[in-house]
């Protein structure tokens, strides 16, 4: 079984999550290639495709959506997605709803089996006005990734690949 774990990243957070997913798959005996997504990669060389992208402004990056619709959906391989959002776990319900909606939109665009949302990391603390708008607690750490959740999800992918 061969899997491509592709990602788009702005700060390295999504790349680090993709690497952890790839490591978890490899530990289960699945050959996992982890790399930034590019249009010149032949996705048909893989049995399974996993793609990740951060949320920015309650949307995935435009190039990611274009890639999913133009390449991933046409590869004829099972697809799973992960979305990274610092706001999702601790923000206001209206932002959670918007992020959930975006995850469902790109899931449909790619014809994906799953679209998981993971907590992310920011480069520093949020300004007070941003904490207020998004409903994020003042003392929230800059890195709130839940590595156990990420590994559970990756192991679930491995289970489905090996079944």
Feature locations, PLM:
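Extreme N-terminal starter segment of soluble prokaryotic enzymes
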Residues: 1-4
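N-terminal Rossmann-fold cofactor-binding loop
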Residues: 7, 37
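Short polar catalytic/cofactor-binding loops
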Residues: 8-12
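FMN-binding flavodoxin-like domain, especially the glycine-rich phosphate-binding loop
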Residues: 13-16, 24, 28-33, 45-163
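Hydrophobic ligand-binding cavity/cleft-lining segments
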Residues: 20
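Short amphipathic alpha-helix with an adjacent loop that forms part of the alpha/beta core around
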Residues: 38-44
């Amino acid at each position: 079984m061969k899997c491509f774990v592709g990602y788009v990243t702005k700060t390295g957070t999504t790349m680090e999550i993709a690497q952890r997913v790839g490591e978890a798959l490899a530990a289960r005996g699945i050959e996992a290639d982890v790399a930034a997504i590019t249009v010149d990669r032949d996705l048909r060389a893989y049995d399974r495709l996993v793609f990740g992208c951060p949320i920015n402004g309650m949307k995935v990056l435009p190039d990611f959506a274009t890639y999913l619709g133009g390449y991933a959906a046409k590869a004829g391989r099972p697809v799973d997605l992960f979305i990274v959002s610092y706001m999702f776990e601790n923000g206001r319900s209206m932002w959670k709803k918007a992020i959930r909606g975006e995850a469902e939109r790109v899931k449909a665009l790619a014809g994906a089996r799953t679209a998981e949302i993971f907590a992310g990391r920011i480069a520093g603390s949020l300004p007070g006005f941003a904490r207020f708008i998004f409903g994020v607690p003042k003392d929230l750490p800059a890195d709130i990734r839940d590595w156990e959740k990420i590994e559970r999800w990756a192991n679930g992918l491995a289970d489905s690949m090996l079944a």
